[in-house]
Amino acid sequence: MNDAQALARIEELNKVLHYHNNLYYQKDTTEISDFEFDTLLQELIELEKQFPLYLKADSPSQRVGGTVTKEFASISHKYPMLSLSNTYSEEEIREFDERVQKAVGHAVEYVCEMKFDGVAISITYKNGMIAQAVTRGDGVRGDDVTNNIKTIKSIPLKIQSATFPEEFEVRGEVYLPYEMFERINQEREDIGEAALANPRNAASGTVKMQDSGIVAKRALDCFIYSLLQDSNKQPTHAAALAQLKEWGFRVSDSYKVCKNVDEIIQYINHWSEERFKLPLATDGIVIKVNDLRLQSELGMTAKSPRWAIAYKFKAEEASTPILSVEYQVGRTGAVTPVANLAPVHLAGTTVKRATLHNANEMERLNLHIGDTVFVEKGGEIIPKITRVDVSKRIAGSQMIPFIQNCPVCDTKLIRIEGEAAWYCPNDKGCAPQITGKIEHFIQRKAMNIDGIGSETIELLYQKKLIRNVADLYTLTYDQLIQLDRFGEKSVTNVLNGIEASKQTPFKSVLFAIGIRYVGSTVAEKLALHFKSINALEKASIEELLQAPEIGIKIAQSIIEWFSVDTNVQLIEDLKKAGVKLELSEHEILKPESDKFAGKSFVISGVFENYERDELKDLILKNGGKISSGITGKLNYLVAGENMGPAKLEKAQKLNITILSEAEFISLLNS
């Protein structure tokens, strides 16, 4: 095939594949089989390899991925991506309608749309071609994830229409369908990795992956819900949605134009039940003023638009019988009861297990063998039991007692004064405690050792190759290559990951060794205060209490940990292995600014765009301090969703400034 023939065939394949993509994703119909489509796509990929000059930016082959992004560029949004005000009640929706009518002076038409639970994305098109895709970020700036978004087959790489603006922006929700979410978790379980918490977290993590080839395999999808351009060509939001569909974007058919607030309530009542039939996670309904001119007139507050509000669904609940209760032992020795349930469909997934937390919770529920219980699922992996349907209790059934001995090593359990949990004290001989400590050691927030999962740790423990975390640094190629499922590449990855972990900062090592009550934040404070493991080991209880945020419970735990000979030997073994057990000069924290100097913060709840650790880093980098509790000396409480009401109430009583996520970012950027 010569150049002219190759170019002609590549252009033909581009046209044909775009046509069939549009049929499948926008019109829900097909003219060829998946096999025929894949054959054409593979032909295109091979031709583009042979004739790379003819590879087009909008080629369907670009959805396959393969681009590796080392670092995501931070991009300013042309139009800020503000959060919506939330409501959970019909009364507040009626109040919203009253505010809108009062502001504009007449009755208003609304559009109601499903609020899909995924990751908000902004996509810019120039001359009909996808130009850039940016995450929501803090609403002002986000990350450039264009290569990853191009792998989503329902997002057009090129507008399949004769007319479109020279430049425009669309916004949508990237999500992971339940089916794919469960498949990914099954694959992770098969290789001994922890399950992903929920589809939203999975989608968020996938969008930020460095390798777009892996992103492509996860089959993300996207519903587009907004069109932005410098001059609106459509009079209403509903007309804009229709225009988006015409251009080839995937728009949910679930939206409805509502003439009044009563129709909004009917829509909510309908989807409160029907949403469970959808193949993806939803967490509410978005209500928008339909008239785009009125949207402009109503404008924005500092945090959210005045012309829209989000109604949030309550957590779903289902009832099912308890089949049995099993007990799990964690790395600290804490014993957690878990109920095995008759399978029940809940929040889009099949639930078979629910946590019972501890003995106090079992006593509160007054659980009996065979009880039917109500199960609620928020964002957790394992749902929780909220109450018992006593009316269905089997006559003569026995109360389920909490066990007295460890379910693994049969050691008698103990209870620490002031704690709800029961513990197995056999921390040097109880297998799940030993492997749990090693799993904790290798995790991303600790030593971040690639190539090792929980299944590998179990195997190494069974083969008596490891008995503590220091043993990881004695593993050899010859030992690993003999193990099942270990090839040359996987052995090399494991050994490289272990070697690289020797450069892990001291604060992370201190967290990784697993002293009780020393989480990542406390470990960082201890590392900055004492500078080395030697100084920490020698510290008296009085000296420990002088460190920031260190109370008597943590201080006593540290003293107790270093009083155990095997722990002292562990530190010596880690030193010999070359692990960093002191701060280097450049690790001594020097704030990048003094914006928050002298200010203390508590962070609580779940946030839309940041992990709590990321918010803590921002505070520390700007000279602020992280506090562990609400006191009169606290300056700010950064409050996310699902934070404890007692903490919020205490902060309000003490007149502490309470910041939302957006308000915190605004304060940071001011």
Swiss-Prot record:
GO terms for biological process: DNA repair; DNA replication. It comes from the Bacteria. NAD(+) binds at D34, F35, E36, F37, D38, S83, L84, E113, R136, E173, K288, K312. Keywords: DNA damage, DNA repair, DNA replication, Ligase, Magnesium, Manganese, Metal-binding, NAD, Zinc. Its cofactor is Mg(2+); Mn(2+). Zn(2+) binds at C406, C409, C424, C430. Residues 591-670 form the BRCT domain. The active site is at K115 (n6-amp-lysine intermediate). Its EC number is 6.5.1.2. GO terms for molecular function: DNA binding; DNA ligase (NAD+) activity; metal ion binding. It catalyses: NAD(+) + (deoxyribonucleotide)n-3'-hydroxyl + 5'-phospho-(deoxyribonucleotide)m = (deoxyribonucleotide)n+m + AMP + beta-nicotinamide D-nucleotide. GO terms for cellular component: cytosol. SUPFAM superfamilies: BRCT domain, DNA ligase/mRNA capping enzyme, catalytic domain, Nucleic acid-binding proteins, RuvA domain 2-like. It is an enzyme of class 6 (ligase). It holds the Pfam family HHH_5. InterPro entries: BRCT_dom, BRCT_dom_sf, DisA/LigA_HHH, DNA_ligase, DNA_ligase_CS, DNAligase_adenylation, DNAligase_N, Hlx-hairpin-Hlx_DNA-bd_motif. DNA ligase that catalyzes the formation of phosphodiester linkages between 5'-phosphoryl and 3'-hydroxyl groups in double-stranded DNA using NAD as a coenzyme and as the energy source for the reaction. It is essential for DNA replication and repair of damaged DNA. Belongs to the NAD-dependent DNA ligase family. LigA subfamily. HAMAP family: DNA_ligase_A. This is DNA ligase. It comes from Cytophaga hutchinsonii (strain ATCC 33406 / DSM 1761 / CIP 103989 / NBRC 15051 / NCIMB 9469 / D465).
